[in-house]
Amino acid sequence: MPQKDPCQKQACEIQKCLQANNYLESKCQAVIQELRKCCARYPKGRSLVCSGFEKEEEEKLAMKSGSK
């Protein structure tokens, strides 16, 4: 049986917040930050819902190293 995603609860909270606020991310920064904190607690690849943040971080690092 697959393991439950450790950050699934936070991801669901983001969806609820976005739906309640007409998908305005600016209204949901607190819950987005909670998901980021959750993702930071687990090794890369452990949480499927964190994969978007992981990709975002990789892109930021690639841009930084390319601008030197």
From Swiss-Prot:
Short name of one Pfam family: CMC4
Limits of the CHCH domain: 4-46
InterPro entries, per database record: CMC4, Cys_alpha_HP_mot_SF
Keyword Mitochondrion among UniProt keywords: yes
Positions of disulphide bridges: C7-C38, C17-C28, C39-C50
This protein's UniProt keywords: Disulfide bond, Mitochondrion
Tissues/organs with expression: Expressed in many tissues.
Assigned GO CC terms: mitochondrion
Compartments, as annotated in UniProt: Mitochondrion
Coiled coil: none
Motif segment (Cx9C motif 1): 7-17
Main location: mitochondrion
Free-text comment about domains: The twin Cx9C motifs are involved in the recognition by the mitochondrial disulfide relay system.
PANTHER family reported in the protein's UniProt record: CX9C MOTIF-CONTAINING PROTEIN 4
Family assignment from sequence similarity: Belongs to the CMC4 family.
Protein name, UniProt field: Cx9C motif-containing protein 4
Lineage of the species this protein comes from: Eukaryota, Metazoa, Chordata, Craniata, Vertebrata
Gene name tied to this protein: Cmc4
